[in-house]
A protein has these predicted regions:
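Divalent-cation-assisted or electrostatically stabilized phosphate/pyrophosphate-binding catalytic cores
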Residues: 218-239, 289-310, 334-338, 360-385, ...
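Short hairpin/turn module used for nucleic-acid contact or packing/dimerization
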Residues: 57-122, 151, 421-464
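Proline-centered turn/helix-capping motifs that create local helix->coil transitions or kinks
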Residues: 129-133, 269-282, 385-392, 403
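Long, repeat-rich segments with strong aromatic
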Residues: 39, 50-53, 340, 347, ...
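Alpha-helical phosphate/pyrophosphate-handling elements in metalloenzyme active cores
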Residues: 145-197, 247, 300-343, 380, ...
Protein backbone atom coordinates (compact mmCIF):
# COMPACT_ATOMS: atom_id res chain seq x y z
CA UNK A 1 0.00 0.00 0.00
CA UNK A 2 1.09 3.57 -0.67
CA UNK A 3 2.37 5.44 2.37
CA UNK A 4 2.01 9.22 2.52
CA UNK A 5 2.87 11.66 5.31
CA UNK A 6 1.34 15.12 5.27
CA UNK A 7 3.23 17.93 6.99
CA UNK A 8 0.97 20.74 8.18
CA UNK A 9 2.84 23.96 8.94
CA UNK A 10 1.87 26.72 11.33
CA UNK A 11 -0.03 28.57 8.64
CA UNK A 12 -2.16 25.57 7.70
CA UNK A 13 -0.18 24.64 4.63
CA UNK A 14 -0.09 20.92 3.75
CA UNK A 15 2.89 19.22 2.14
CA UNK A 16 2.54 15.54 1.09
CA UNK A 17 5.67 13.40 1.46
CA UNK A 18 5.89 9.93 -0.11
CA UNK A 19 9.21 8.72 1.31
CA UNK A 20 7.78 7.34 4.54
CA UNK A 21 8.73 4.27 6.59
CA UNK A 22 6.08 2.90 8.96
CA UNK A 23 6.20 -0.28 11.04
CA UNK A 24 4.14 -1.54 13.94
CA UNK A 25 4.43 -3.97 16.85
CA UNK A 26 2.67 -5.17 20.00
CA UNK A 27 -0.75 -6.23 18.73
CA UNK A 28 -3.87 -6.01 20.88
CA UNK A 29 -6.97 -8.14 20.29
CA UNK A 30 -10.41 -6.72 20.99
CA UNK A 31 -12.68 -8.95 23.06
CA UNK A 32 -15.65 -7.39 21.26
CA UNK A 33 -14.76 -7.95 17.60
CA UNK A 34 -11.68 -10.22 17.89
CA UNK A 35 -9.81 -7.95 15.51
CA UNK A 36 -6.14 -7.17 16.09
CA UNK A 37 -4.79 -3.63 16.25
CA UNK A 38 -1.18 -2.41 16.61
CA UNK A 39 -0.41 -0.60 19.85
CA UNK A 40 2.99 0.85 18.88
CA UNK A 41 4.35 2.30 15.64
CA UNK A 42 7.67 3.53 14.31
CA UNK A 43 7.51 6.45 11.87
CA UNK A 44 10.56 7.63 9.92
CA UNK A 45 10.47 10.44 7.33
CA UNK A 46 14.02 10.99 5.94
CA UNK A 47 13.13 14.22 4.13
CA UNK A 48 12.07 15.81 7.42
CA UNK A 49 14.71 14.05 9.53
CA UNK A 50 11.75 12.90 11.59
CA UNK A 51 12.05 9.72 13.67
CA UNK A 52 9.10 9.01 15.97
CA UNK A 53 7.80 6.32 18.30
CA UNK A 54 4.02 6.34 18.59
CA UNK A 55 2.28 4.46 21.41
CA UNK A 56 -1.42 4.05 22.20
CA UNK A 57 -2.32 5.72 25.49
CA UNK A 58 -4.23 2.56 26.44
CA UNK A 59 -5.36 -0.48 24.51
CA UNK A 60 -9.18 -0.50 24.61
CA UNK A 61 -9.90 2.35 22.18
CA UNK A 62 -11.85 0.41 19.59
CA UNK A 63 -15.01 1.95 18.16
CA UNK A 64 -17.44 -0.93 17.69
CA UNK A 65 -19.93 -0.43 14.87
CA UNK A 66 -21.74 -2.45 12.22
CA UNK A 67 -20.95 0.28 9.69
CA UNK A 68 -17.48 -1.07 8.92
CA UNK A 69 -16.31 -4.52 7.87
CA UNK A 70 -15.32 -6.60 10.87
CA UNK A 71 -17.46 -4.66 13.32
CA UNK A 72 -15.08 -1.94 14.45
CA UNK A 73 -12.08 0.31 13.95
CA UNK A 74 -9.40 1.75 16.20
CA UNK A 75 -9.68 5.42 17.10
CA UNK A 76 -7.97 7.02 20.05
CA UNK A 77 -5.20 8.94 21.78
CA UNK A 78 -1.49 8.23 21.39
CA UNK A 79 1.72 9.56 22.92
CA UNK A 80 4.64 10.46 20.67
CA UNK A 81 8.38 10.63 21.38
CA UNK A 82 11.39 10.87 19.10
CA UNK A 83 13.47 13.43 17.26
CA UNK A 84 13.25 15.95 14.43
CA UNK A 85 16.40 17.31 12.84
CA UNK A 86 18.36 15.85 15.73
CA UNK A 87 16.31 17.49 18.47
CA UNK A 88 14.14 15.59 20.93
CA UNK A 89 10.40 16.02 20.44
CA UNK A 90 7.34 14.67 22.24
CA UNK A 91 3.63 15.21 22.32
CA UNK A 92 0.17 13.74 22.14
CA UNK A 93 -1.71 12.69 19.06
CA UNK A 94 -4.73 10.92 17.62
CA UNK A 95 -4.82 7.80 15.49
CA UNK A 96 -7.45 6.04 13.43
CA UNK A 97 -6.88 2.55 12.05
CA UNK A 98 -9.43 0.57 10.06
CA UNK A 99 -9.60 -3.08 9.03
CA UNK A 100 -6.24 -4.29 10.32
CA UNK A 101 -7.35 -7.93 10.59
CA UNK A 102 -10.90 -7.90 9.31
CA UNK A 103 -13.30 -10.69 8.37
CA UNK A 104 -16.33 -10.88 6.11
CA UNK A 105 -18.38 -13.71 7.60
CA UNK A 106 -18.89 -15.78 10.74
CA UNK A 107 -16.33 -18.34 9.61
CA UNK A 108 -13.79 -15.52 9.45
CA UNK A 109 -14.84 -14.39 12.92
CA UNK A 110 -14.28 -17.88 14.32
CA UNK A 111 -10.84 -18.02 12.69
CA UNK A 112 -9.94 -14.78 14.47
CA UNK A 113 -11.29 -16.20 17.73
CA UNK A 114 -9.30 -19.40 17.21
CA UNK A 115 -6.10 -17.51 16.50
CA UNK A 116 -6.46 -15.45 19.67
CA UNK A 117 -7.36 -18.50 21.77
CA UNK A 118 -4.24 -20.32 20.57
CA UNK A 119 -2.10 -17.31 21.43
CA UNK A 120 -3.64 -17.00 24.88
CA UNK A 121 -3.29 -20.69 25.66
CA UNK A 122 0.35 -20.55 24.58
CA UNK A 123 0.87 -17.85 27.22
CA UNK A 124 -1.06 -19.76 29.86
CA UNK A 125 0.58 -23.11 29.08
CA UNK A 126 4.25 -22.23 28.49
CA UNK A 127 6.64 -24.83 27.11
CA UNK A 128 9.34 -23.39 29.37
CA UNK A 129 8.83 -22.17 32.96
CA UNK A 130 8.38 -18.36 32.92
CA UNK A 131 9.76 -18.08 36.45
CA UNK A 132 9.77 -19.96 39.74
CA UNK A 133 7.31 -17.42 41.13
CA UNK A 134 4.86 -18.07 38.28
CA UNK A 135 5.14 -21.85 38.64
CA UNK A 136 4.67 -21.64 42.40
CA UNK A 137 1.61 -19.40 42.09
CA UNK A 138 -0.29 -21.17 39.33
CA UNK A 139 0.92 -24.79 39.51
CA UNK A 140 2.79 -25.94 42.61
CA UNK A 141 0.99 -23.92 45.27
CA UNK A 142 2.01 -23.30 48.84
CA UNK A 143 3.81 -26.65 49.11
CA UNK A 144 6.32 -25.74 46.38
CA UNK A 145 9.75 -27.06 47.35
CA UNK A 146 13.32 -26.61 46.22
CA UNK A 147 14.64 -29.24 43.85
CA UNK A 148 11.55 -29.34 41.65
CA UNK A 149 12.49 -29.71 38.00
CA UNK A 150 10.26 -26.97 36.61
CA UNK A 151 11.09 -27.85 33.00
CA UNK A 152 9.89 -31.41 33.62
CA UNK A 153 6.63 -30.01 34.98
CA UNK A 154 6.15 -28.08 31.74
CA UNK A 155 7.14 -31.11 29.67
CA UNK A 156 4.65 -33.44 31.34
CA UNK A 157 1.78 -31.10 32.25
CA UNK A 158 1.77 -28.40 29.56
CA UNK A 159 3.49 -29.79 26.47
CA UNK A 160 1.01 -32.65 25.87
CA UNK A 161 -1.90 -30.22 26.06
CA UNK A 162 -0.20 -27.69 23.80
CA UNK A 163 0.32 -30.46 21.24
CA UNK A 164 -3.47 -30.45 20.88
CA UNK A 165 -4.38 -26.78 21.41
CA UNK A 166 -1.75 -25.56 18.92
CA UNK A 167 -3.66 -27.40 16.19
CA UNK A 168 -6.59 -25.07 16.68
CA UNK A 169 -10.25 -25.79 17.19
CA UNK A 170 -13.65 -24.18 16.77
CA UNK A 171 -13.28 -22.15 20.01
CA UNK A 172 -17.02 -21.39 20.05
CA UNK A 173 -17.18 -21.86 23.83
CA UNK A 174 -14.77 -18.97 24.30
CA UNK A 175 -16.76 -16.83 21.87
CA UNK A 176 -19.95 -17.44 23.85
CA UNK A 177 -18.26 -16.76 27.21
CA UNK A 178 -16.46 -13.57 26.18
CA UNK A 179 -19.38 -12.19 24.17
CA UNK A 180 -21.73 -12.84 27.10
CA UNK A 181 -19.50 -10.88 29.45
CA UNK A 182 -19.16 -7.89 27.15
CA UNK A 183 -22.85 -7.96 26.23
CA UNK A 184 -23.67 -7.75 29.95
CA UNK A 185 -21.15 -5.00 30.72
CA UNK A 186 -21.63 -1.28 30.17
CA UNK A 187 -17.88 -0.84 29.69
CA UNK A 188 -15.39 -2.94 27.76
CA UNK A 189 -14.13 -5.95 29.73
CA UNK A 190 -10.80 -7.65 29.07
CA UNK A 191 -11.97 -11.14 29.95
CA UNK A 192 -9.20 -12.99 28.13
CA UNK A 193 -8.03 -14.86 31.22
CA UNK A 194 -11.40 -16.59 31.50
CA UNK A 195 -10.63 -18.35 28.25
CA UNK A 196 -8.78 -20.79 30.52
CA UNK A 197 -12.17 -21.95 31.82
CA UNK A 198 -13.74 -22.56 28.43
CA UNK A 199 -10.76 -24.07 26.64
CA UNK A 200 -8.89 -26.11 29.27
CA UNK A 201 -12.09 -27.72 30.54
CA UNK A 202 -12.83 -28.75 26.96
CA UNK A 203 -9.36 -29.87 25.89
CA UNK A 204 -8.87 -31.88 29.08
CA UNK A 205 -12.03 -33.83 28.32
CA UNK A 206 -10.90 -34.43 24.72
CA UNK A 207 -7.62 -35.96 25.89
CA UNK A 208 -9.39 -38.30 28.31
CA UNK A 209 -12.15 -39.13 25.80
CA UNK A 210 -9.58 -40.18 23.22
CA UNK A 211 -7.99 -42.60 25.67
CA UNK A 212 -11.33 -44.11 26.64
CA UNK A 213 -12.44 -44.39 23.00
CA UNK A 214 -9.05 -45.77 21.91
CA UNK A 215 -8.90 -43.05 19.25
CA UNK A 216 -5.74 -42.37 17.28
CA UNK A 217 -6.45 -39.04 15.50
CA UNK A 218 -7.62 -35.70 16.88
CA UNK A 219 -7.68 -32.37 15.03
CA UNK A 220 -5.65 -33.71 12.14
CA UNK A 221 -2.83 -35.19 14.24
CA UNK A 222 -2.08 -38.02 16.61
CA UNK A 223 -4.01 -38.17 19.86
CA UNK A 224 -2.06 -37.03 22.90
CA UNK A 225 -1.86 -40.51 24.42
CA UNK A 226 -0.33 -41.88 21.20
CA UNK A 227 2.56 -39.42 21.28
CA UNK A 228 3.03 -39.04 25.05
CA UNK A 229 1.74 -42.29 26.49
CA UNK A 230 -1.45 -43.06 28.36
CA UNK A 231 -0.14 -42.21 31.83
CA UNK A 232 1.14 -38.75 30.86
CA UNK A 233 -2.00 -38.04 28.83
CA UNK A 234 -4.29 -38.91 31.75
CA UNK A 235 -2.29 -36.71 34.10
CA UNK A 236 -2.12 -33.76 31.70
CA UNK A 237 -5.79 -34.07 30.73
CA UNK A 238 -7.00 -34.17 34.32
CA UNK A 239 -4.53 -31.43 35.24
CA UNK A 240 -6.22 -29.14 32.73
CA UNK A 241 -9.38 -29.11 34.84
CA UNK A 242 -7.53 -27.69 37.82
CA UNK A 243 -5.23 -25.38 35.87
CA UNK A 244 -8.32 -23.75 34.35
CA UNK A 245 -9.52 -22.60 37.76
CA UNK A 246 -6.05 -21.39 38.73
CA UNK A 247 -5.22 -19.48 35.54
CA UNK A 248 -8.63 -17.80 35.29
CA UNK A 249 -8.01 -16.02 38.59
CA UNK A 250 -11.14 -17.14 40.41
CA UNK A 251 -9.40 -16.52 43.74
CA UNK A 252 -8.93 -12.84 42.86
CA UNK A 253 -12.65 -12.21 43.40
CA UNK A 254 -14.52 -11.61 46.68
CA UNK A 255 -15.32 -14.81 48.63
CA UNK A 256 -19.03 -14.77 47.72
CA UNK A 257 -18.20 -14.58 44.01
CA UNK A 258 -15.51 -17.26 44.36
CA UNK A 259 -18.03 -19.61 45.95
CA UNK A 260 -20.54 -19.14 43.13
CA UNK A 261 -17.89 -19.66 40.46
CA UNK A 262 -16.41 -22.77 42.07
CA UNK A 263 -19.88 -24.28 42.64
CA UNK A 264 -20.77 -23.74 38.99
CA UNK A 265 -17.44 -25.02 37.70
CA UNK A 266 -17.40 -28.24 39.71
CA UNK A 267 -21.08 -28.83 39.00
CA UNK A 268 -20.20 -28.82 35.29
CA UNK A 269 -17.27 -31.17 35.90
CA UNK A 270 -19.38 -33.65 37.86
CA UNK A 271 -22.15 -33.64 35.27
CA UNK A 272 -19.59 -33.96 32.48
CA UNK A 273 -18.13 -37.09 34.04
CA UNK A 274 -21.61 -38.51 34.56
CA UNK A 275 -22.33 -37.85 30.89
CA UNK A 276 -19.10 -39.51 29.85
CA UNK A 277 -19.98 -42.52 31.97
CA UNK A 278 -23.35 -42.77 30.26
CA UNK A 279 -21.67 -42.39 26.87
CA UNK A 280 -19.21 -45.18 27.66
CA UNK A 281 -22.07 -47.43 28.79
CA UNK A 282 -23.81 -46.65 25.52
CA UNK A 283 -27.43 -46.91 24.45
CA UNK A 284 -27.37 -50.40 22.98
CA UNK A 285 -29.47 -51.75 25.84
CA UNK A 286 -32.36 -49.50 24.76
CA UNK A 287 -32.20 -50.45 21.10
CA UNK A 288 -34.11 -53.79 21.12
CA UNK A 289 -37.29 -52.13 22.40
CA UNK A 290 -36.97 -49.22 19.95
CA UNK A 291 -36.36 -51.59 17.03
CA UNK A 292 -39.25 -53.85 17.99
CA UNK A 293 -41.81 -51.13 18.73
CA UNK A 294 -40.66 -48.02 16.89
CA UNK A 295 -41.08 -46.09 20.14
CA UNK A 296 -38.00 -43.89 20.50
CA UNK A 297 -39.01 -41.29 23.11
CA UNK A 298 -36.96 -42.76 25.96
CA UNK A 299 -34.01 -43.51 23.66
CA UNK A 300 -33.98 -39.94 22.35
CA UNK A 301 -34.23 -38.49 25.86
CA UNK A 302 -31.29 -40.65 26.94
CA UNK A 303 -29.07 -39.42 24.11
CA UNK A 304 -30.17 -35.84 24.68
CA UNK A 305 -29.16 -36.10 28.34
CA UNK A 306 -25.68 -37.33 27.36
CA UNK A 307 -25.23 -34.39 24.98
CA UNK A 308 -26.37 -31.94 27.65
CA UNK A 309 -24.18 -33.38 30.41
CA UNK A 310 -21.09 -33.48 28.20
CA UNK A 311 -21.50 -30.36 26.06
CA UNK A 312 -24.61 -28.29 26.70
CA UNK A 313 -24.21 -28.13 30.46
CA UNK A 314 -20.63 -26.90 30.20
CA UNK A 315 -21.63 -24.16 27.74
CA UNK A 316 -24.53 -23.16 29.97
CA UNK A 317 -22.22 -23.02 32.96
CA UNK A 318 -19.84 -20.69 31.13
CA UNK A 319 -22.75 -18.35 30.38
CA UNK A 320 -23.87 -18.47 34.02
CA UNK A 321 -20.32 -17.72 35.18
CA UNK A 322 -20.28 -14.71 32.85
CA UNK A 323 -23.41 -13.50 34.62
CA UNK A 324 -21.83 -13.93 38.05
CA UNK A 325 -18.71 -12.05 36.96
CA UNK A 326 -20.72 -9.13 35.59
CA UNK A 327 -23.44 -8.93 38.25
CA UNK A 328 -26.24 -9.77 35.83
CA UNK A 329 -29.86 -10.04 36.92
CA UNK A 330 -31.46 -13.40 37.68
CA UNK A 331 -33.60 -13.08 34.55
CA UNK A 332 -30.52 -12.49 32.39
CA UNK A 333 -28.64 -15.34 34.07
CA UNK A 334 -31.46 -17.83 33.55
CA UNK A 335 -31.88 -16.82 29.92
CA UNK A 336 -28.17 -17.01 29.12
CA UNK A 337 -27.61 -20.30 30.93
CA UNK A 338 -30.45 -21.96 29.05
CA UNK A 339 -29.12 -20.44 25.83
CA UNK A 340 -25.69 -22.00 26.47
CA UNK A 341 -27.22 -25.40 27.22
CA UNK A 342 -29.28 -25.36 24.02
CA UNK A 343 -26.35 -24.13 21.92
CA UNK A 344 -24.26 -27.05 23.17
CA UNK A 345 -27.07 -29.52 22.49
CA UNK A 346 -27.67 -28.07 19.02
CA UNK A 347 -23.94 -28.28 18.27
CA UNK A 348 -23.93 -32.01 19.01
CA UNK A 349 -27.10 -32.63 16.99
CA UNK A 350 -25.57 -30.85 13.99
CA UNK A 351 -22.37 -32.87 14.47
CA UNK A 352 -24.38 -36.10 14.33
CA UNK A 353 -26.11 -34.96 11.15
CA UNK A 354 -22.90 -33.80 9.45
CA UNK A 355 -21.28 -37.14 10.18
CA UNK A 356 -23.78 -38.67 7.79
CA UNK A 357 -23.93 -35.82 5.26
CA UNK A 358 -20.15 -35.49 5.14
CA UNK A 359 -17.88 -32.72 6.42
CA UNK A 360 -16.56 -29.98 4.14
CA UNK A 361 -12.98 -30.59 3.08
CA UNK A 362 -13.30 -34.34 3.75
CA UNK A 363 -12.29 -33.79 7.38
CA UNK A 364 -14.08 -37.02 8.21
CA UNK A 365 -15.42 -39.82 6.08
CA UNK A 366 -19.20 -39.63 5.76
CA UNK A 367 -20.82 -42.31 7.91
CA UNK A 368 -18.03 -42.88 10.45
CA UNK A 369 -20.65 -43.15 13.19
CA UNK A 370 -22.42 -45.94 11.28
CA UNK A 371 -19.13 -47.79 10.86
CA UNK A 372 -18.43 -47.39 14.59
CA UNK A 373 -21.91 -48.63 15.53
CA UNK A 374 -22.94 -45.41 17.29
CA UNK A 375 -26.55 -44.71 18.15
CA UNK A 376 -26.82 -41.07 17.11
CA UNK A 377 -29.56 -38.48 16.75
CA UNK A 378 -30.37 -39.21 13.08
CA UNK A 379 -30.48 -42.96 13.75
CA UNK A 380 -32.96 -42.53 16.58
CA UNK A 381 -35.09 -40.12 14.56
CA UNK A 382 -35.20 -42.67 11.73
CA UNK A 383 -36.13 -45.57 14.01
CA UNK A 384 -39.34 -43.74 14.86
CA UNK A 385 -40.29 -43.53 11.17
CA UNK A 386 -38.92 -46.63 9.42
CA UNK A 387 -40.76 -49.90 8.97
CA UNK A 388 -39.90 -52.69 11.36
CA UNK A 389 -37.91 -54.49 8.66
CA UNK A 390 -35.83 -51.38 7.98
CA UNK A 391 -35.32 -50.78 11.71
CA UNK A 392 -33.99 -54.30 12.09
CA UNK A 393 -31.70 -53.81 9.08
CA UNK A 394 -30.24 -50.57 10.44
CA UNK A 395 -29.63 -52.13 13.85
CA UNK A 396 -27.98 -55.19 12.29
CA UNK A 397 -25.52 -53.05 10.32
CA UNK A 398 -24.73 -50.91 13.36
CA UNK A 399 -23.87 -54.01 15.38
CA UNK A 400 -21.52 -55.22 12.65
CA UNK A 401 -19.20 -52.18 13.00
CA UNK A 402 -18.62 -52.69 9.31
CA UNK A 403 -16.14 -50.94 7.08
CA UNK A 404 -18.11 -51.99 4.01
CA UNK A 405 -18.80 -48.70 2.25
CA UNK A 406 -21.86 -50.12 0.51
CA UNK A 407 -23.51 -51.21 3.76
CA UNK A 408 -22.73 -47.89 5.45
CA UNK A 409 -24.23 -45.99 2.53
CA UNK A 410 -27.32 -48.19 2.55
CA UNK A 411 -28.02 -47.17 6.15
CA UNK A 412 -27.45 -43.50 5.31
CA UNK A 413 -29.89 -43.86 2.41
CA UNK A 414 -32.57 -45.30 4.68
CA UNK A 415 -32.09 -42.45 7.15
CA UNK A 416 -32.37 -39.94 4.31
CA UNK A 417 -35.51 -41.63 2.99
CA UNK A 418 -37.42 -40.57 6.12
CA UNK A 419 -35.74 -37.13 6.31
CA UNK A 420 -34.08 -38.02 9.61
CA UNK A 421 -30.85 -36.15 8.86
CA UNK A 422 -32.54 -32.94 7.69
CA UNK A 423 -34.97 -33.11 10.61
CA UNK A 424 -32.00 -33.03 13.00
CA UNK A 425 -30.86 -29.76 11.45
CA UNK A 426 -34.38 -28.36 11.75
CA UNK A 427 -34.53 -29.33 15.43
CA UNK A 428 -31.15 -27.70 16.05
CA UNK A 429 -32.36 -24.46 14.44
CA UNK A 430 -35.54 -24.52 16.52
CA UNK A 431 -33.58 -25.07 19.74
CA UNK A 432 -31.42 -22.04 18.97
CA UNK A 433 -34.33 -19.80 17.99
CA UNK A 434 -36.37 -20.70 21.07
CA UNK A 435 -33.40 -20.17 23.40
CA UNK A 436 -32.42 -16.87 21.78
CA UNK A 437 -35.79 -15.17 22.28
CA UNK A 438 -35.42 -14.57 26.08
CA UNK A 439 -31.76 -13.60 25.60
CA UNK A 440 -32.77 -11.06 22.98
CA UNK A 441 -35.42 -9.69 25.32
CA UNK A 442 -33.23 -9.34 28.42
CA UNK A 443 -29.87 -8.24 26.97
CA UNK A 444 -29.40 -4.68 25.68
CA UNK A 445 -28.43 -4.41 22.03
CA UNK A 446 -24.67 -4.35 21.43
CA UNK A 447 -22.09 -5.64 18.99
CA UNK A 448 -21.19 -8.45 21.40
CA UNK A 449 -24.82 -9.55 21.40
CA UNK A 450 -24.79 -9.41 17.61
CA UNK A 451 -21.67 -11.62 17.55
CA UNK A 452 -23.51 -14.22 19.62
CA UNK A 453 -26.49 -14.09 17.27
CA UNK A 454 -24.28 -14.43 14.20
CA UNK A 455 -22.65 -17.52 15.68
CA UNK A 456 -26.08 -19.04 16.38
CA UNK A 457 -27.05 -18.69 12.75
CA UNK A 458 -23.73 -20.14 11.63
CA UNK A 459 -23.95 -23.07 14.04
CA UNK A 460 -26.88 -24.69 12.29
CA UNK A 461 -25.61 -23.90 8.77
CA UNK A 462 -21.99 -25.00 9.21
CA UNK A 463 -20.49 -27.70 7.02
CA UNK A 464 -17.62 -28.91 9.22
Amino acid sequence: KEKVAVLTDGKGGRIPIHDVQISYEKLWTSMTTYMEYPMQWKLFVPELQLDLRVKAAFSAQEFATVLVQGGGFYEGRVTVTGSRQGKAVSGKGFIERKNHTTFTDTEGLLKNVGRFVRQKLAEMYPLEPPSKQWMDKYVLGRNATAGTDLQKVCDTLFKPVRALTDRGGKSWRSLILVSSMNALSKDYVDCSRYIALSELLHVGSLIIDDIQDESVVRRGGKCVHIDYGVATAINAGCGSYFMAASLSGIDDHPPAVQLQLYNLYFDALRAGHAGQGLDIAGLDHLMPHAVESGEVGHLLDSLRSIHIYKTGGAAGTLCRMACVLTGASTEQANALENFGVQVGLAFQIVDDALNLKGFEGDLKEAGEDIRDGKVTYPVIKALGRLTKADREYVWTILQEHTGDRGKVQSVIDKLKSVAAIEDCLVEARNLIEDAWEPVDRTLPDSLSKLMMRAFCSYLTERTY
